[in-house]
Amino acid sequence: MAPKISISLNPPYNGEFYSSNDQMSGIVSLQLTKALSIRKISVILKGFSETLTKIDQEYMFQQNGMMMPGQDNKSFHTLMKFEQRVFPPDNVWNALDGSSKPFKVKPGSYNYSFQFEKFPRKPECLKNHTAKTVAFVTRNNARLPPTFNSHWQEFNKIDNLDLYFYSFGKVIYMVQVQIELGKSSSWFKPFHKLIREIETFEFIPEPKDLIVEPDEDDNEELNAFSNNSRGNSLVTNNEFFNSSNLKVPSKDVKVVNGVGYIKSDRNFSQANSILIENGDIRSRPVSSVTSTRQSTRLVNGMKVFPSTYKMGLPDGESNMRIEVRSRDLKQIYRKDYLFRSGSQNFDKVYVVMEGNIASLSKMQITPLKLQLNLLETTTYLSQGIANGNYSSLKLIEIDLNQLKSNKPLLDLNEIRENFDGSMFECELRLKDHPILRKLVFNEEDYRHRGNRLYSFKTCTIKRIFSLQLLIEWGINGIRKQSEVNIDPVQIFCQVREHVEAEALPRYVPPPTYTEMAS
């Protein structure tokens, strides 16, 4: 009967997943029912990333003018690998002086403890990167990535093409026990036999090592070559799925410190927008999204995120747009308030109007519905070929008029003009809505396709998020919709650390003394 091996890992410090400050440790249990010749037992801590990208026949035909079979491109990167021998002990191993003679281990149960150093900050594969290695990161901003798609085998069992392609990129960490048996006495089995057992675990670095560096040349218009294999979009379970396959042009690859990396992968990682039309969520054509790229500006120290388009008003001359103003909307942690006053997220939303103030003051403008979506763009890269996967998570959908309040969310009596009188603005007080002001981000620690919600970028995998705020308006009985995109937003699955001031010690009055009579 074969030996029985089990691996028991000590729990992480936070009780949920291993992080940068953890030291992987545990116990290896070995049960033998009969004597076994063992040369050594090793514990290996390792991590790797793997991507598979595809080019379909239609794209190959456009490039070569002939039908050719679809091409698969694979990439494999070793992120870390550490080995520790637990049997025999160091003093015995050193005394062997290179001898390969095995030990005869009697039947019974044996336990071996192990402990590794803290996780490294940078991946090991960087030493193998060259100028011909096309990657999403440089040597300077490369960090050890989090676990991603560790349950990829389950995707292959589901009859869903989107999940199937989503599983083509993965980051896996594991502890592996390797038992090297003694050499067989038979001449036809001249090699040492290996017995292996693995235990995967979830690793997510500290937030400072998850931050996705902004792409260079962000304002430069890049022309990626599409193979026109963008599939039909569909909506299931409040999720929007899409995918695309593109070839990274050589002009978009820059060499830094001897490593080629993509200056900006904006074109093949731009998610489709979601529209509400007659009560249904529908996808907007790609052309209308890319042609309305937003630009942010600063007002009173706050970033301004304008709506993607202006809405014409009934008088035919005026228009309005929505602006989200925030100091810290580019990073969102789990359990952060989204609309609450002081959250610095969606607590300052303004309606900005252009036109005649007399005409504007007569209009009936009312917010009717609100929907907030989290858009995910996951891009896999292999040998210069990039495949994009897109999805959308609905964070909230609410009828703004369902709960009546004494004060309306938008009061045009509070409208004010700017310094030159060309524009007018009025605050949309979403922070006063009784439901929205209690809404926190990802309170339940949701797993999307088996993964927690976090942004990251590594050599061949990039996962970024953006937020999409949709508001349906009633303007003099006509329904219109505004859309604001915050792209990208750094998402963390950790809870934000709040630094609390140390409380002052309680005042204790000094003791009183009385003079004793002599």
Curated annotation (Swiss-Prot):
What keywords were assigned to this record?
A: Cytoplasm, Endocytosis, Isopeptide bond, Ubl conjugation
What residues does the Glycyl lysine isopeptide (Lys-Gly) (interchain with G-Cter in ubiquitin) crosslink join? 118
Tell me a GO cellular component.
cytoplasm
Protein modification: Ubiquitinated by RSP5.
Xref: InterPro entries = Arrestin-like_C
Organism domain of life: Eukaryota
Quote the subcellular location field of this record: Cytoplasm
UniProt record, GO biological process: endocytosis
What family classification does the UniProt entry report for this protein? Belongs to the ART10 family.
Subunit annotation: Interacts with RSP5.
Which protein, by its recorded name, is this? Arrestin-related trafficking adapter 10
Q: Which organism is it from?
A: Saccharomyces cerevisiae (strain Lalvin EC1118 / Prise de mousse) (Baker's yeast)
The opening ranks of the lineage are: Eukaryota, Fungi, Dikarya, Ascomycota, Saccharomycotina
